[in-house]
Amino acid sequence: MNTVIRTIFIILLLSAATAEIRAQEGLHSASIFQKYGKQKGVTMVELSKDMLDSYRINLYKSLVFKDVTEELPYILDCLEKDRKEGTMKKLQEIVEDGKLLTAYYQLPQLKKNNQTLNRFILFKVGKKNSATFIYIEGNLNSDELVALL
């Protein structure tokens, strides 16, 4: 009996992981979480719909880099590839001295469980080369997202 329960639990976990990966499928930016999510000096946070329901957010994933100096070229390259391929629309960018400091992008909508979800990527370089990279999906629109920030 324990084996059956364990097998069902593993199948459910794999299904949830597959659905999450599918949500970011086709994005170069998705590889940022895979590449740096468990790296020393990086904090990864993932919150589910249960934690975020009052904000109309279904999924929140973020990476906080203590020092993004080494990772920054890869992150910027992924963002540029996604922009060039038309997989995301620029909502706002702040560039200072030729360097991207803040960016808000909207991704194509996602159909999931009879819902149409909006998806966003947020990126900000802070003081002392710290940085935050965020992926959000939910029912909120871009104006609501900006109001939350």
Predicted features by range, described:
Residues 1-29:
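Bacterial Sec-dependent N-terminal signal peptides
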Residues 9, 37-40, 80-83, 149:
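Generic secondary-structure transition motif, activating predominantly at the C-termini of alpha-helices
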Residues 23-25, 40-43, 81-84, 111-115:
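A short linear-motif detector with a strong N-terminal bias
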Residues 26-78:
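Early exported N-terminus immediately downstream of N-terminal targeting peptides
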Residues 64-100:
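Compact soluble domain cores
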Residues 85-148:
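Surface-exposed, polar helix/loop patches in the mature regions of secreted/periplasmic/lumenal proteins
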